[in-house]
Amino acid sequence: MTVKVLVVDDSSFFRRRVSEIINADPRLEVIGNAVNGKEAVELVKKLQPDVITMDIEMPVMDGITAVREIMKVLPTPILMFSSLTQEGAKATLDALDAGALDFLPKKFEDIARNRDEAISLLQKRVGELARKRMFMRRPLRTTPAVAPASRYSAPVNAALTREAALTTAARTTAARVTPTSTTRQTMHSAVAAKPMARFKASGKKYQLMAIGTSTGGPVALQKILTQLPANFPYPIVLVQHMPATFTAAFAARLNNLSKISVKEAEDGDTLRAGVAYLAPGGKQMMLEGRPGSARLRILDGGDRMNYKPCVDVTFGSAAKVYNDKVLSMILTGMGADGREGARMLKTHGSTVWAQDEESCVVYGMPQAVAKAGISTEDLPLERFAERILVEVGR
């Protein structure tokens, strides 16, 4: 059974190009085209695609507004196409907040070294996102009880509500309901309603927290970091696969939403408690020195690395500096980046957690770590912040 795809773009050339690439994969099939967001919303209701590719800037209704409307009427995995500009970065992050799951640069030459690689990447992204459709549309209980809010809980925007809905939907079997904005609030409440085991601190001592992620990472990182207190006791290093022009905008957004400080990492930064350092896109981020005075090195890293930034590079250097004092996490993402770095951390005695399959947008990086027997705990996204705070005694 093929994956049904709706292509949305006001450029006839781009619609044709994307459609040709998608249809070249026998597992995928373009079932419709829309020239603006309003038309896309109507076609979603009519065709019920498995995945949507969406432009951002369009007449009549832009892509961000269309994403919000689609999440109200029929939640569907959406892959955004955007320009690699600062404005494009902000718009893309807005689209992810609205409910889109992933994005790619609109100029294919910006994401791959050759044409075949770009084609394969687009086909793979569409196929991976299709796997989340069943979770986004799974019926939910309509009248859950609501548990008291934690003192560390933070406001949850549309994207985070959707992420919680993915996990809850995968775990419940109830009567079908029509997906409306009210239903999506109910989805989030259902997470709190489910009895959950209490966490216990391991008793280990840490000096650094490290997180690596890719596809689905912007929402996942926002979900976790916005729930950490301003007096978080350790520095945090973040590695998110993201283009160079996006990381500054993403760090600024996280900083505005979080109690901790978040910044795009710079060469020579001294790691400070309560500050999260996001690896800049197109570079490698390494740690050097000693705990308490460790610094960041930002390097080009050469063309041999598949990922820039690369989780393995950052985690490996963290293991050498901090030995057994790192609390590390591998979150949602395609591929296996982070596995070898996490292996080094575990060998040095540090802690490695992984995101569970049900709450991942793409269960690739966490799966690689879990299958290798490296992670000690596999957690749903909505419980990571709680687990962290218990572990560090906050």
Curated annotation (Swiss-Prot):
Q: Which reaction does it catalyse?
A: [protein]-L-glutamate 5-O-methyl ester + H2O = L-glutamyl-[protein] + methanol + H(+); L-glutaminyl-[protein] + H2O = L-glutamyl-[protein] + NH4(+)
Q: What modifications follow translation?
A: Phosphorylated by CheA. Phosphorylation of the N-terminal regulatory domain activates the methylesterase activity.
> What residue intervals traverse the membrane?
none
Show the GO MF annotations. phosphorelay response regulator activity; protein-glutamate methylesterase activity; protein-glutamine glutaminase activity
Q: Name one GO cellular component term.
A: cytoplasm
> What information about domains appears in the record's comments?
Contains a C-terminal catalytic domain, and an N-terminal region which modulates catalytic activity.
What this protein is reported to do is described as: Involved in chemotaxis. Part of a chemotaxis signal transduction system that modulates chemotaxis in response to various stimuli. Catalyzes the demethylation of specific methylglutamate residues introduced into the chemoreceptors (methyl-accepting chemotaxis proteins or MCP) by CheR. Also mediates the irreversible deamidation of specific glutamine residues to glutamic acid.
- Name of the protein in its database record: Protein-glutamate methylesterase/protein-glutamine glutaminase 2
Tell me what organism the protein belongs to. Answer: Photobacterium profundum (strain SS9)
Task: Output the lineage of the source organism.
Answer: Bacteria, Pseudomonadati, Pseudomonadota, Gammaproteobacteria, Vibrionales
